[in-house]
Amino acid sequence: MSKIIGIDLGTTNSAVAVLEGGEPKIITNPDGGRTTPSVVSFKNGESQVGDVAKRQAITNPDTIISIKSHMGEAGYKVTADGKDYTPQEISAMILQYIKGYAEDYLGEKVEKAVITVPAYFNDAQRQATKDAGKIAGLEVERIINEPTAAALAYGLDKLDKDEKILVYDLGGGTFDVSILELGDGVFEVLSTNGDTHLGGDDFDNKIIDYLAAQFKADNGIDLKDDKLALQRLKDAAESAKKTLSSANEAQIDLPFIASGDQGPLHLQTSLSRAKFNELTADLIKKAEQPVLNALKDAGLSFSDIDEVILNGGSTRIPAVQESVKKLTGKEPNHSINPDEAVALGAAVQGGVITGDVKDVVLLDVTPLSLGIETMGGVFTKLIDRNTTIPTSKSQVFSTAADNQPAVDIHVLQGERSMAADNKTLGRFQLSDIPAAKRGVPQIEVTFDIDRNGIVSVSAKDLGTQKEQKITIQAAGGLSEEEIEQMMNDAKANEEADAKKKEAVDTRNEADQLIFSTEATLEEAGDKLSDDDKKATQEALEALKKAKEDAAAEDADLTDLKAKTEALAKAAQELAMKLYQQAAPKEGAEGEAKPKG
């Protein structure tokens, strides 16, 4: 069975790992990084992903960051380089880039992946993630929750231990808490909670707001109104936040950030860790309640927890670590790299699927309750949150009026009592119900949740056995046709990118050959006759002309390749002549003189 890679598709950064020799290993990107910025930029019809995209974020307005925070959002699109893109398409570009460098590392095609999502992602967000994988040309074998993946990475070498662990996962854009029980190779999620709109970006924004307010008070100019200045502020805020994880003060120096009546203005200030803690105190406080909720749902107290695992880059913030320690009464475990653990755990799950990892069983849960709208707009739950998945649950309902010919099934996800306060996953109708008094027809509604947390719902008239089924596709979700089209577009871009790379390689090869041949001719000097050098010189000039003719981006490179090949052959013959010309001389110098 081919390798299944594990991908942590993050808000700020992404990572990929693979199982080698029974151990998960991070695959580095072409820049040598162990994580890749989840950034996509567009320019002149071309897209770039990762570090190169992030580096131009300041100067290129068509740069997209933190797209994960919009996954599953109905109707959401971003416009870049004159074209609209869904979050699934942008995420697919990141996945395609990751897939590409994973293939380069493995030396084989990668077609399957385990992709992680925040534990508190709803059905629409999970489906959007799966669609992104499909667009990128990946068969998504499993969607698993990020804290669960981190627990797999932590517990792989502790299969003989019985532990209850709390995973505190604060990433770039999302926050999750999961409580798991580990024992005899079984990783059982007892509960999960979180906030899909709380993460490192929010900490950055607190610094941005503070710096912008300070600058406005001093100079009367709002830097947030200037896109370029705002991007510079964002970069400075992120850098300051990272500095304050290990230092008590961060210097912020942004020259020529704006222009005033007296000329250019500069932002030069410092930010202390104490001030940063003050600015972000409400965010850290906000993260406490999900921890308490998860503990309550698991039926445990803090004294029952054996280990507290920190995951996600934002857990490097000292105030976050201090808050976790104070709340749980335990020193957090730092044995796993918070930036890499999720990808490593996803690779372990990939190994479980292929059979390369034995004796590991993962039992995950659904993060939110599922049900339907019933009379009076009430939300009737069929599956409670924190139910182990996969699972199935049925309940019989009836009609609300006499001779009702059809029932509308309104599928919801959430914890509120009234349907209107919960998240709509989808709607469908069961029709042709025989005329009868209200309450007589028996309509059985069944919910199925698969291992990926994807929901299917069916409704059956028990009298006629007529049945209607849907796999939930939330508003704003993609149809199969749209996914197919996006897959074709992605493939076309992949082929176009490959052609561009081939063109660059061809031109580089020609350049290198011209340079090395000129050096060889110079070295030959008077050692060879003009006749000996003639063929090489002619081939050299021919290649130079072919290179000029093929300078246009869309030029046909056939002639350039042929002339490169011709010069390579001529240069080889020239080198051979040089070698032969030098050989007898070296032999003569090396001969021993007879004794006289």
From Swiss-Prot:
Protein induction: By stress conditions e.g. heat shock.
Q: Which residues carry this modification: Phosphothreonine?
A: T174
Annotated keywords: ATP-binding, Chaperone, Nucleotide-binding, Phosphoprotein, Stress response
- Tell me any Pfam family this protein matches: HSP70
Give any GO molecular function from the UniProt entry: ATP binding
Q: Which Gene3D superfamilies match?
A: 1.20.1270.10, 3.30.420.40, Actin, Chain A, domain 4 (3.90.640.10), Substrate Binding Domain Of DNAk, Chain A, domain 1 (2.60.34.10)
NCBIfam families according to UniProt? PRK00290.1, prok_dnaK
Family stated for the protein in its record: Belongs to the heat shock protein 70 family.
Protein task? Acts as a chaperone.
HAMAP family, alphabetized:
DnaK (MF_00332)
User: What's the name of the protein?
Assistant: Chaperone protein DnaK
